[in-house]
C-alpha cells in the first residue's frame, strides 16, 4: 500500500522551523529520496508516511491525502 502526502504542509514545517530538507529527513528517519518522492507526488510506503507525520506532529496523520493499493 502506498500513500500520497501534502508536500506543502511539510515544506511549511521545514521553513517555519528553519530546517534544511536534509535535517528534516534525518529527524524523521527517512531518506532524502523519500522526501523527493513526496515532493514529486509519487506514492511512498505508509510506514514512511507515518514517520513524516510523527516528525511534524504526533497527531498530524491528516496529511495523508490518499491511499492507493499497488
Residue map of PLM features:
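Residues in the helix-turn-helix
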Residues: 23, 34, 62
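Short C-terminal boundary/hinge segments that cap the last helix of small helical domains
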Residues: 57-70
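A short, Lys/Arg-rich alpha-helix, primarily the initiator
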Residues: 1-22
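The alpha-helix within a helix-turn-helix
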Residues: 14, 25, 53
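Recognition helix of helix-turn-helix/homeodomain-like DNA-binding domains
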Residues: 29-44
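Short, basic-rich loop-to-helix N-cap that marks the start of a DNA-contacting helix
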Residues: 41-54
Amino acid at each position: 500500500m502506498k500513500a500520497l502526502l501534502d508536500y506543502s504542509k511539510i515544506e511549511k514545517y521545514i521553513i517555519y522551523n528553519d530546517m534544511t530538507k536534509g535535517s528534516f529527513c534525518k529527524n524523521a528517519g527517512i531518506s532524502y529520496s523519500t522526501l523527493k518522492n513526496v515532493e514529486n507526488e509519487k506514492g511512498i510506503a505508509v510506514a514512511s508516511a507515518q514517520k513524516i507525520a510523527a516528525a511534524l506532529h504526533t497527531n498530524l496523520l491528516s496529511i495523508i491525502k490518499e491511499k492507493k493499493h499497488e
